[in-house]
Amino acid sequence: MEVLMLGQADVRRLLDPDRLLTALEAGFRAISEGSVDVPPRVAANTDAGFLAAMPGYARDIGLATKLVSVFRGNHERGLPSHQALICLFDAGTGSPVAIMDGTHVTAVRTAGAAAVSVRHLARPEARVLAIIGAGVQGASHLEMLSRVRDFGEIRVASRTLASATALARTDPRAHAVEGFEAAVRGADVVALCTHSGDPVVRREWLSPGTHVTSVGYAPPSGELDRAIAEEGRLYVESRAAAFRPPPAGCAELAGMAPEAATELGELLLGRARGREDPDELTVYKSMGHAIEDLVSAVLVLDAARREQIGTGFDF
């Protein structure tokens, strides 16, 4: 039995962003249809970070698990804070099929899921994007959100003006802004991409009709102002995952009723309503979901087989 190994360079080459958006939508529909099995993530904590396991199965899609380590201090060592491996298995036999880099997958699928929310919830005429956070996720959001809306202005703000400026230089539409409030006032879409344990944007800074995405994970609190979650029309990947007690669930939503949120899959299936008013505040809060990793890894593996890329080893 041969197992295919794919490094990060392979994954970067093979993971098509536009196909990923389509695959993520299929994954969200599967979640809301109940055709998935995804247990709560488990983690082993160390003094410096943690290692989490995220297994998931989706009928007619596949079976996979991701191992992801999150070590916040890695930036000081020149290493990513998030590093991951994804293992794909044959859903009929349980035999291992592929092992691939999951670090790039995690970065792109997270931003891709946010882009799905922008595609279906932001106002069609949205032209101003504010990105809060200029790290890996800030860069991924700049790429992926631009695929679903024609932004004319992109504002980037971060803890340091230097990091915001560095990211802004990668896109002619982007410019660095000093201060989070200045970045988000008047923006049509606000993307929160930080590791902050405290809210980085206040509800009163947001204009009517804003769409907010938040992908940060920093229990026991987080980057999203609770008032934004409570006052906006809230969307999540999975209520079962988002409303588990932290740290398995979303810290910013702790204590809220699960019925306060709509799953993106319900919206895509036509079972729930989306934006109904141009002045409505819409909010997407991400926890990260194993099905996002699964659909991404399946795309990569299919492309690797077509292009005969990767290194096989006998299992």
Question: PLM features: what roles do these ranges have?
Answer:
Residues G133-G135:
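Glycine-rich Rossmann-fold phosphate-binding loop(s) that bind the pyrophosphate
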Residues G138-A139:
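N-terminal Rossmann-fold NAD(P) dinucleotide-binding loop
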Residues L129-A130, T282:
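Conserved beta-strand elements of the Class I
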Residues M1-V105, A115, E125, T262, ...:
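N-terminal ligand-binding/catalytic initiation module
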Residues P172-G255:
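Rossmann-like adenosine-cofactor binding region
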Residues L121-V128, D150, S207-P208:
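Short helix-loop-beta connector
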Residues R147-T170:
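NAD(P)-binding Rossmann-fold cofactor-contacting core
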Residues A218, G222-F315:
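Adenosine-phosphate binding glycine-rich loop
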